[in-house]
């Protein structure tokens, strides 16, 4: 049997679907090709004689859609396009694999939940039946939404960037915790949770952050946090020039004699909520309102709007309003800008002991080795492009980082 390298939907059969992608092996693969042909490959499942194709022989077509691509990346196969990223890009959807379980497979998966090699226990025929159901659903979307270069860039950039962060376990107390970034959320803002620990929801006041510390003796947890991030992002896409710090300039222009932190809160409310008459007196916010109106007009006319950098589609927004549509685009703008930024940052860590430890919305957290403290200044320069500036925080643990 020879592997056919042509466009398809690929569903890996893995050793245990309940484990982290870094802890599983690929025991088989199912392919549904665009011409309707199917191919089944068994590597190690006991139900059938192993095929004469090994995992190392698999070289996917560049436009093959791969379900759960993370598992392949951890197994050193980087070809193909992640299915959930693709679905999220075009139809704001993603696949819950449990919803496609055939009846017998669902029963076995629940009964033998704690079995180490669950994938070896469930009959291969049931797993191929499950894979076929997913592939046929994806193929219907695939035929209606041909893959373009923006989609390829989006899917590959997101899977590769978050893999480079996710592969670094985090030291929490005396144990290491795995990360699991999931970016196919409604707004595109990634979550990060695994095995009952939610890094994205860590409270700053309950002490949970105090347990996160450096993996290196005398190492430092260092966070880079953009200053006035959303307002500068909007200024970038609106081609609006501030003469000095945006918050200070807007406050002075509007003659608002209130506490600075209180004013920042008002700015945030006017960006993400309705722009008040007071703020409409400023040319920047009039430009923002014009953009809000333009986005909503496009949504009403075309039934969708597209993200700024990768042109990801947003459609079927529930109870859509001008501000809600704009919020979707704005939050995707934040994430897409940061993914592109991380992509440019990662080469600075090549051959370094220090690691990119975690991404938390518009904050970037690194575990810096004591011999590489000069890396902080290198990273600062890399972050501070596009008129952006960062605040830098450092500490022995994540809960006690202080601005430096």
Where are the model-predicted features located?
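Conserved catalytic core of nucleic-acid polymerases
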Residues: 167, 252-359, 368, 386-390, ...
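Mixed-charge, glycine-rich, non-catalytic linkers/tails in nucleic-acid processing enzymes
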Residues: 75-103, 107-112, 116-175, 240-242
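Positively charged interface segments
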Residues: 374-391
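Acidic, glycine-rich two-metal-ion catalytic cores of nucleic acid-processing enzymes
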Residues: 18-35, 43-47, 174-258, 311-349, ...
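Short His-Asn-centered micro-motif
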Residues: 66-69, 224-226, 270, 368
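Short secondary-structure junctions
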Residues: 63-65, 115-117, 352-357
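Non-catalytic, well-ordered alpha-helical scaffold segments
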Residues: 24, 125-132, 136, 152-159, ...
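Conserved RNase H-like, two-metal-ion catalytic cores of nucleic-acid enzymes
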Residues: 1-102
């Amino acid at each position: 049997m020879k592997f056919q390298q042509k466009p398809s939907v690929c569903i890996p059969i893995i050793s245990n679907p309940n484990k982290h992608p870094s802890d599983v092996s690929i025991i088989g693969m199912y392919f549904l090709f665009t011409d309707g042909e199917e191919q089944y490959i068994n590597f190690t499942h006991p139900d059938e004689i192993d095929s004469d194709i090994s995992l190392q022989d698999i070289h996917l077509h560049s436009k093959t859609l791969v379900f759960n691509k993370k598992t392949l990346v951890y197994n050193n196969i980087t070809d193909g396009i992640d299915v959930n990223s693709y679905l999220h890009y075009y139809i704001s959807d993603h696949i819950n694999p449990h919803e496609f379980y055939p009846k017998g497979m669902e029963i076995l998966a629940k009964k033998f939940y704690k079995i180490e090699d669950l994938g070896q226990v469930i009959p291969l025929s049931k797993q191929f039946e499950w894979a076929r159901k997913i592939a046929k659903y994806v193929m219907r979307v695939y035929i209606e939404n041909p893959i373009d270069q923006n989609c390829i860039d989006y899917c590959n950039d997101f899977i590769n960037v978050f893999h480079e962060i996710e592969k670094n376990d985090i030291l929490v107390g005396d144990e290491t915790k795995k990360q699991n970034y999931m970016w196919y959320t409604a707004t595109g803002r990634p979550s990060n949770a695994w095995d009952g620990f939610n890094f994205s929801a860590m409270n700053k006041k309950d002490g949970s952050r105090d347990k996160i510390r450096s993996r290196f003796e005398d190492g430092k947890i260092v966070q880079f946090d953009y200053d006035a991030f959303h307002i500068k992002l909007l200024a970038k896409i609106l081609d609006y020039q501030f003469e000095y710090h945006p918050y200070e300039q807007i406050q002075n222009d509007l003659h608002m004699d209130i506490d600075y932190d209180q004013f920042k809160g008002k700015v945030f409310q006017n960006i993400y909520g309705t722009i008040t008459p007071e703020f409409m007196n400023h040319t920047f916010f009039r430009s923002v309102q014009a953009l809000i109106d333009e986005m909503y007009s496009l949504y009403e006319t075309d039934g969708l709007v597209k993200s700024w950098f990768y042109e990801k589609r947003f459609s079927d927004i529930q109870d859509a309003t001008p501000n809600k549509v704009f919020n979707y685009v704005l939050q995707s703008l934040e994430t897409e800008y940061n993914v592109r930024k991380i992509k440019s940052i990662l080469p600075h860590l090549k051959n370094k002991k220090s690691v990119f430890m975690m991404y938390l919305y518009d904050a970037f957290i690194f575990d810096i080795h004591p011999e590489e403290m000069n890396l902080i200044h290198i990273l600062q320069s890399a972050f501070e492009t596009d008129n952006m500036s960062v605040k830098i925080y450092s500490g022995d643990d994540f809960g006690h980082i202080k601005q430096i």
